[in-house]
């Protein structure tokens, strides 16, 4: 879109596109800010951090889940109303359903986190799934689906039609465009990439990184 520079588009990248698709899918299921908070797992990651910022811009209350509690202030600056340790979502344990704690959720990590987000989503709510950093598998009962009408929504940012990609990029360039966008992406050189990949594998990175191949 004309309203985005090339660098701004790369700050969003696939992760930002996935975040925008996740928010849009919740909207299509009827999500509104007045329904209650949206939980976001993997909050300091590329998808999670942009999801928080977009949701906040659209007026939603956000509960951020992260293992990096030292990043609490950063997450609140992005727009999180509350920051909780990621493992607190699993306190529901083996129970088939838990207390209804959020209206909707965006899950970026999979595994038991996805299952337990679903168990604690309010009746009629939805949870999007776009990642598997924790696990590609999860186990739960069907009770959240058949007793609360909770929906599990898959997010695909690769094989969706180009018309859909065009539509969501237009929203990213308009009502979903974040102010001071460059603060969401740290620019690094191509030579620094191996170092940052090591940090990523050690779970020591936060947010988005843009590689300047000419730097």
Question: Which residues make up each language-model segment?
Answer:
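Glycine-rich phosphate-binding loop and adjacent beta-alpha segment
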Residues: 112-178, 213-214
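Mid-domain Rossmann-like dinucleotide-binding core that forms the NAD(H)/NADP(H) cofactor-binding site
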Residues: 10-86
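Short amphipathic alpha-helix with an adjacent loop that forms part of the alpha/beta core around
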Residues: 89-100
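Phosphate/diphosphate ligand-binding glycine-rich loop within oxidoreductases
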Residues: 1-7
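N-terminal Rossmann-like NAD(P) cofactor-binding module of classical short-chain dehydrogenase/reductase
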Residues: 103-106, 128
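Local beta-strand N-terminus motif with an aromatic residue
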Residues: 80, 101-103, 145
């Amino acid at each position: 879109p004309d309203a985005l520079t090339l660098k701004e588009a790369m700050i969003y990248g696939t992760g930002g596109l996935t975040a925008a698709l996740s928010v849009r899918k919740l909207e299509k299921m009827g999500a509104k800010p007045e329904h209650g908070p949206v939980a976001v797992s993997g909050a300091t990651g590329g998808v999670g951090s942009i999801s928080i910022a977009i949701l906040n811009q659209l007026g939603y209350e956000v509960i951020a889940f992260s293992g990096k509690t030292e990043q609490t202030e950063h997450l609140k600056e992005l727009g999180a109303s509350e920051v909780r340790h990621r493992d607190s979502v699993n306190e529901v344990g083996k129970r088939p359903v838990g207390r209804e704690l959020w209206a909707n959720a965006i899950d970026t990590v999979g595994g038991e986190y996805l299952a337990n987000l679903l168990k604690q989503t309010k009746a009629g709510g939805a949870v999007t799934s776009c990642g598997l950093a924790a696990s590609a598998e999860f186990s739960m009962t069907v009770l959240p689906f058949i007793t609360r009408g909770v929906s599990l929504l898959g997010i695909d940012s690769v094989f969706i039609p180009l018309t859909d990609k065009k539509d969501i990029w237009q929203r990213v360039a308009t009502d979903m465009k974040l102010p001071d966008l460059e603060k969401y992406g740290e620019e690094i050189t191509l030579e620094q990439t191996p170092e940052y990949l090591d940090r990523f594998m050690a779970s020591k990175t936060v947010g988005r990184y843009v590689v300047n191949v000419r730097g």
